[in-house]
Amino acid sequence: MNNSEELRQQLHSINRKSYPAYKALKGVYHFGNYLLSIDHVQGDPFASPSHVSVQISHTDARFPKEYYKNFLSRTTLCDYLTRQFEKQVSHFSFRAKGSGKSGLITVSHCDQEILSRTACEINEKGITVRFFVGFPANGRTINATELEKILFDFLPVCVRKSFFYCSLDAQNLLNYMQLAEDQEFIHHELSCRNLCAFVADGAILPRESGISSHPMKDSIPFNSPESLRISMELPHQGTITGMGIPKGITLIVGGGYHGKSTLLNALELGVYNHIPGDGREYVITDNTAVKLRSEEGRFIKDVDISLFINDLPNKKDTHCFSTLDASGSTSQAAGIVESMEAKSQLFLLDEDTSATNFMVRDAFMQQVIQRDKEPITPFLERARDLYEKAGISTILVAGSSG
């Protein structure tokens, strides 16, 4: 392992050379209270940026041990640290000049969900963060002076402000960790109370726009119907109330623009924990939930869709069905069967994105097309059996089909 001064000398020695000379920098360098590892060097300044990582020992980082004692706490802490690092590097990205991607400093972007990511990991040795740096060049000539700024001026500031407990807002981090524990508690309560989902009173479900996952300003907070309102005593937040959706078959109905799909979309993402301030912090759904839709044109390989589709005109065997170009109904049937194979216990469906002929056949169409002429058994005829025989619940948005 080399020290930081040896890296500085290497930078001076390759300055103004051809860009491939940067590859000599690959290796691990000691920067006092952290290790800098240059893992992959880009081929030229216009290629995907170089891969760099930093390792900080637990002794130096000094986070309380309970913050990384199990998978939930490690995932939550890593998510928090990644967001802090993303915020810090955004102040310095492209401040080092050059051509192409020169000066870029970036890490995997975190959206509103708290997820396990390879960008930041915690093990028994310490914290590892992986990110990208555009090594600077003028044309295809190395500009080591600018890379020196990144590695010796910008990066130490970002690391210090992001990965050392003494540099962070301890109360803010504690609130972040406690929220995750409250969310995990609700996940556990769902099974104990025979529920498949929970939506807290006061939740903000609408999003800012179709391309933004941030909460919509001035939106109406969720208010549970009295018939479904329950209360929970959380470990940290205390008592909260909201709508508990029981296992079984649940219909979400209402007029247009009344939030049916918005509620279903929130339930879809309720399998993940959300960050404070998202509005959906206490929208919690069964971890096995799957959002299903028609996927016309998809590939299907050896799936038994005979539960829904039989006696196709071309004599194709639906017990082991394959196609390169599925129809709307066969694609949705395959999606349901695949979800059953994956042990899903909750299906989420919206009639707007479903194949109508797969979902329902009204009385008029049953008279027009006799049952022996129709290969499709509608989902609504199977929904009760799915719950009673396989324990699979359904939440369905309906606005036009009875």
What are these regions (language model features)?
Residues 298, 308-329, 361-376:
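Flexible beta-alpha connector loops of hexameric P-loop NTPases
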Residues 340-388, 400-401:
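Conserved P-loop NTPase nucleotide-binding/switch module
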Residues 206-241, 284-289, 293, 298-300, ...:
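N-terminal pre-Walker A segment at the start of P-loop NTPase domains
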Residues 269-280:
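Post-Walker A helix-loop "phosphate-sensing" segment adjacent to the P-loop in P-loop NTPases
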Residues 164-220, 291, 297, 316-320, ...:
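Long, charge-dense accessory insertions within large macromolecular proteins
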Residues 320-354:
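Phosphate-binding/switch loop-helix module in NTP-utilizing enzymes
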Residues 240-268:
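Glycine-rich phosphate-binding P-loop
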